[in-house]
Amino acid sequence: MDALRPGSPYQPIIEELRNYPQKRFYNVSKLGGTKYDVLPYSIRVLFESSIRNCDGFLVKETDAMNILDWKTKQNDVEVPFCPARVVLQDFTGIPAMVDFAAMREAVRNAGGDPVKVNPACPTDLTVDHSLQIDFSKCAIQNAPNPGGGEAQKPTAKLSPLKGQPRKLPCRGQSSCKGPCSAGELSRASGQFSAQIENTPILCPFHLQPVPEPETVLKNQEMEFGRNRERLQFFKWSSKVFKNTSIIPPETGMAHQVNLEYLSRVVFDVEDFLYPDSVVGTDSHTTMVNGLGILGWGVGGIETEAVMLGMPVTLTLPEVVGCELTGTASPLATSIDIVLGITKHLRQAEVAGKFVEFFGSGVSQLSVADRTTIANMCPEYGAILSFFPVDNVTLKHLRHTGFDEAKLEVMEAYLKAVKLFRNGESSSREPEYSQVVQISLSSIIPHVSGPKRSQDRVAVNNMKSDFQTCLNEKAGVKGFQIAAEKQNDVVPVQYEGNQYELSHGCVVIAAVISCTNNCNPSVMLAAGLLAKKAVEAGLEVKPYIRTSLSPGSGMVTHYLSSSGVLPYLSKLGFEVVGYGCSTCVGNTAPLPEAIRNAIKQGDIIACGVLSGTKNFEGRLCDCVRANYLASPPLVVAYAIAGTVRIDFETEPLGTGFNGRSIYLRDIWPTRKELHTVEEECVISSMFKELKEKMEKGNKRWNSLEAPESPLFPWDLKSTYIRCPSFFDKLAKEPVSLQPIENAHVLLYLGDSVTTDHISPAGSIARSSAAAKYLTNKGLTPREFNSYGARRGNDAVMTRGTFANIKLLNKFIGKPAPKTIHFPSGQTLDVFEAAELYQKEGIPVIILAGKKYGLGSSRDWAAKGPFLLGVKAVLAESYEKVHKSQLIGIGIAPLQFLPGENPNTLGLTGREQFSILFPPELSPKMTLDIKTSTGKVFSVFALFENDVEITLYKNGGSLNFVARRFL
């Protein structure tokens, strides 16, 4: 969007920023007065956007005043919102950029200047999603080698060595199988422990480069080859369209880094300042609210509308204030706190609302904590969870490499418009729809087990709870061990040393990151605890099967850049590769002596892991008690060697000089954790990321793309085609034409989803899309999915209503078929629609309640339009989909209350005629006449003048295109 809308009625409140006279901004706090001062921070962002983008048509003065009157208007009015930018994924980016390329073509053909066609706001498109795997990563790469001996070495390419941390000695011969020389994979117990991500990592024992498996490199090459055409189109887009940046594949950015790298927090466009805000098709879009950036996920057609300069519309939401107080327990990890907060929010019924955090406890949460909470909105149903910018945010941005001068301007601006939150409790907090109070001190760390993940046990009750499990009858928790046998000890000889096993002994300890990727600080906490333990002289018994599975390159970066990997290794937590190896039970077998001792003494041995599943016997058939715990607690229980320990009163073990070491002595404080995270990890991570972004990658840099302002469409392409949305584009829209003698293409029931309308999965071999691709010379293996072919309107039109579960009442059973009434033939939906179009017969759709349920999907509106559908007549609609129909030029009509096809005696075999008056008005009624002589009234579901204008123009694409003529 433009920083300054020409002709805005609010230009008199534009001011210069104090101490920065060259910087200007809308001082919305002066306009709003005391009403503004009590608005939630998130609503203040909506208000500023409405003031800055007010043009009297798309955004009216009444919209701005409705937002200012949020307290009385919440839930009652619809308001427009013009986000500052858009984030797209490759799947949703293809159709959006294809539409822009087609619009340029149409504008040129209609006599306009195609170079003027550009996204109206900054648009970032990430091309970092693997679409297909050609070479298996071997799901059991960590399984035991039953044949024994040396496993065959795969050909591998070495990752570059980033640095040489201080070497620490190995635990002993049992856990070290020889030197990890260049070109050789590290082995433990005869298994490969190779990474499966393109991220440099060192062998944790010998600090040598770990190779990348050949399969990864092959997959990357195959993926690049398969997607070359689309990648060339993206590269062309980045060259010719203003406001467009493409994040190329293999950049290796996790969602958090990706979103933070793209985030501005405050926009500075030609010295005009305004808050950052975003909508995106990525499900992780809400994560940016943890940085004080208002944003949420929408469908592809909504993001495209924003790119076209249109606002998104939302019902002015309730805002739930979440007050955080108290101090977190020392043993509570970030994940404990995050899960504790999300649990409270689930119980608070915040679905469909904004959540905003305030209170003294907010400053205890790092930005990683905040973004994780914000990212978990789907867990508790909120639209977003907003953390206003504060000193913690600024400190984080400083460590990510934000320019200091920009930070100073940012802080001054946010304070000027009252969008900056002070750490201390303010005398005047915003007024919220409701307040949920959460005391951080009430969040107690738990473990789950011993058999089911839903059986949670407070860590301080663990010893007594395990004792209860021994006593209870065999069942969901109990083991029914006789009282006289509960203190049995079984001696065992292992590697020349004598050990004792008893009930509760830990024999498997696995630090797994599959549930911790969005907040790697808990993995860092495990590493810092390991460091302190090693420095204190603590060890892990060698018979305990320990392992470390980082889960992602981001977690590896946390562990390696902070220098804790060698300490984890010293305790036996050796990297076993990326992937949930221990989660799915692929751990190395326990030593035979240990297995025999457990079975001989009928010992209830324990596994402790930080995964998600702990079913009995999952890790090993002789390990009957399995607990899920946070990564640092996994390390702590491994050191203790038993779960029958009270961490408050009993030491983990004996350190140097015979000193008893308690958990509190080595547990990292939250301050320590945040300091290491911000100063060591975050700063180096963003430095590396920016270098990678500036350098690009070899394949992307060498990729050739056209230089012309118009895209040279390849008529042979099966991925990218110029769509026909603009075929009738002229400077002025044609007057509304009646829909005369329309046949019903489909007669559908209730709850028809967008997936019924436009499936995203694989292309069935018998489908119309498959026939088209076969005629283009493709084999079934090359069909790919509908999602991958969203840039080809011919495939997507043929895929419309191609879901095999579609229930058309004309057919009577689930099938993507319908009847072509003039001929009486039963055909594929596309074939019937094609015949109707050749005959010049318009078609409509009859449907029941909740038409268009499910995820927003652009082709669920575009597809029916290209099939020739002029109107949908339903009992009710999913709101977003109804707006999408208008946005593409299809009339959404609704039966009057109490009426439906059955009550009106409609069979769907009639022909329907719909007359439009010369002037449409919001929510007006229209008359429909059938070929049988029946006349009935329906609502035309146009909510406002904007929707009527879009419909008259044939949809938003044509409406915007006409602006360039």
Curated annotation (Swiss-Prot):
Report the cofactors. Answer: [4Fe-4S] cluster
Q: Which GO terms describe its cellular component?
A: cytosol
Q: Which InterPro entries match?
A: AcnA_IRP_Swivel, Acnase/IPM_dHydase_lsu_aba_1/3, Acoase/IPM_deHydtase_lsu_aba, Aconitase/3IPM_dehydase_swvl, Aconitase/IRP2, Aconitase_4Fe-4S_BS, Aconitase_4Fe-4S_dom, AconitaseA/IPMdHydase_ssu_swvl
Is Transmembrane helix one of the keywords? Answer: no
SUPFAM superfamilies reported for this sequence: Aconitase iron-sulfur domain, LeuD/IlvD-like
Q: Can you tell me which residues bind [4Fe-4S] cluster?
A: C514, C580, C583
What biological process terms from GO does the record include? intracellular iron ion homeostasis
| Cofactor notes | Binds 1 [4Fe-4S] cluster per subunit. [4Fe-4S]-binding affects RNA-binding activity, thereby inhibiting activity of the protein.
Recount the PTM note.
Ubiquitinated and degraded by the proteasome in presence of high level of iron and oxygen.
Region of interest (Disordered), ranges? 142-170
Q: Where in the cell is it found?
A: Cytoplasm
Q: Which CDD domains match?
A: AcnA_IRP (cd01586), AcnA_IRP_Swivel (cd01580)
Region forming the signal peptide: none
Q: What is its main location?
A: cytoplasm
| This protein's UniProt keywords | 4Fe-4S, Cytoplasm, Iron, Iron-sulfur, Metal-binding, Phosphoprotein, RNA-binding, Ubl conjugation
Top-rank taxon of the source lineage equals: Eukaryota
MF terms per GO, please?
A: 4 iron, 4 sulfur cluster binding; aconitate hydratase activity; iron-responsive element binding; metal ion binding
The UniProt family comment states:
Belongs to the aconitase/IPM isomerase family.
Q: What does this protein do?
A: RNA-binding protein that binds to iron-responsive elements (IRES), which are stem-loop structures found in the 5'-UTR of ferritin, and delta aminolevulinic acid synthase mRNAs, and in the 3'-UTR of transferrin receptor mRNA. Binding to the IRE element in ferritin results in the repression of its mRNA translation. Binding of the protein to the transferrin receptor mRNA inhibits the degradation of this otherwise rapidly degraded mRNA.
The name of this protein is Iron-responsive element-binding protein 2
Q: Upper taxonomic classification of the species?
A: Eukaryota, Metazoa, Chordata, Craniata, Vertebrata
Gene name as annotated = IREB2
